[in-house]
Amino acid sequence: MDVVKKSRNVHGSNDFSELIVSVRRVAKVVKGGRRFSFSVLVVIGDEKGKVGCGIGKHLEVSEAKIKAVNAARKNMIRVHLRESRTLHHDVKAKFCSSKVMLRSAKVGTGIIAGGSIRLIFEVLGVQDVVAKSIGSSNPHNVVYAVFAAFRKMLSPKQVANKRSRKIGDIIENR
């Protein structure tokens, strides 16, 4: 039972936005029957380039969400953005059978993405991006595929070092 819930909270002193991607009721089969609990997938971000995801499991949804937020805080990564609105370059990644393609976009394009990918870009602070999900649409796998893509991205400084050029040459040729 996957439910996409958009609940935006500003939590604690770090000012992170939280969005619930999915809430599932899971069952553990034991000798006496089934034991039900909840699994919550959450993405958090500061809307300035930092984003994290986490999963929490508990008997109650609210406790599972707290666990997921704590896991997401431990799993934060920094994504370098161009002009604080889009990605620096296009990137593809795969996690299990979910593949994602993320492309930078011109000003005014908006977030063209579906489902859980859109939620990630909202908390990341991206305003213009085109994203495509291919294969499995399982929210967990799609979220992890997007994070794999973020880890593959290079900052302009890394690209300049790789090409033995100055950062200004890389940025001005866009």
From Swiss-Prot:
This is Small ribosomal subunit protein uS5. Residues 16-79 form the S5 DRBM domain. Part of the 30S ribosomal subunit. Contacts proteins S4 and S8. The gene is rpsE. GO terms for cellular component: small ribosomal subunit. InterPro entries: Ribosomal_Su5_D2-typ_SF (IPR020568), Ribosomal_uS5 (IPR000851), Ribosomal_uS5_bac-type (IPR005712), Ribosomal_uS5_C (IPR005324), Ribosomal_uS5_N (IPR013810), Ribsml_uS5_D2-typ_fold_subgr (IPR014721). The keyword RNA-binding applies. SUPFAM superfamilies: dsRNA-binding domain-like, Ribosomal protein S5 domain 2-like. Belongs to the universal ribosomal protein uS5 family. Gene3D superfamilies: 3.30.160.20, 3.30.230.10. It comes from Ehrlichia chaffeensis (strain ATCC CRL-10679 / Arkansas). The N-terminal domain interacts with the head of the 30S subunit; the C-terminal domain interacts with the body and contacts protein S4. The interaction surface between S4 and S5 is involved in control of translational fidelity. GO terms for biological process: translation. GO terms for molecular function: rRNA binding; structural constituent of ribosome. With S4 and S12 plays an important role in translational accuracy. Located at the back of the 30S subunit body where it stabilizes the conformation of the head with respect to the body. Keywords: Ribonucleoprotein, Ribosomal protein, RNA-binding, rRNA-binding.
